[in-house]
Amino acid sequence: MQPRVLLVAALLVLLASARALEAEDPSLLDLMQGYMQHATKTAQDTLTSVQESQVAQRARDWMTDGFSSLKDYWSTFKGKFSGFWDSASEAQTTPASDAS
């Protein structure tokens, strides 16, 4: 009788350990799914950050180019009309000096 009792006890132990492993498998699966979701989110955040950085860089370049062009236009405008302004201011001061 003792061999049968030992056999039944061994089977019960194996059955209990199999159930314990089954209980651990879903939690291991949950851990892996959580890890994969975290890794996916991290990769997406990094990609978004890089894309936003590239967009921001393009915007900065566009603004710099725009201000540079505006400065060039202003310099050209000043260059063309500075002679006119200088001669106009001289013309205004000349009649006053002639009258005295």
UniProtKB/Swiss-Prot annotation:
Pfam families: Apo-CIII. InterPro entries: Apo-CIII (IPR008403), Apo_CIII_sf (IPR038195). Disulfide bonds: none annotated. Component of triglyceride-rich very low density lipoproteins (VLDL) and high density lipoproteins (HDL) in plasma. Plays a multifaceted role in triglyceride homeostasis. Intracellularly, promotes hepatic very low density lipoprotein 1 (VLDL1) assembly and secretion; extracellularly, attenuates hydrolysis and clearance of triglyceride-rich lipoproteins (TRLs). Impairs the lipolysis of TRLs by inhibiting lipoprotein lipase and the hepatic uptake of TRLs by remnant receptors. The most abundant glycoforms are characterized by an O-linked disaccharide galactose linked to N-acetylgalactosamine (Gal-GalNAc), further modified with up to 3 sialic acid residues. Less abundant glycoforms are characterized by more complex and fucosylated glycan moieties. O-glycosylated on Thr-94 with a core 1 or possibly core 8 glycan. The lineage of its organism: Eukaryota, Metazoa, Chordata, Craniata, Vertebrata. One of its GO terms (biological process) is negative regulation of high-density lipoprotein particle clearance. It comes from Mirounga angustirostris. GO terms for molecular function: high-density lipoprotein particle receptor binding; lipase inhibitor activity; phospholipid binding. Keywords: Chylomicron, Glycoprotein, Lipid degradation, Lipid metabolism, Lipid transport, Secreted, Sialic acid, Signal, Transport, VLDL. Belongs to the apolipoprotein C3 family. This is Apolipoprotein C-III.
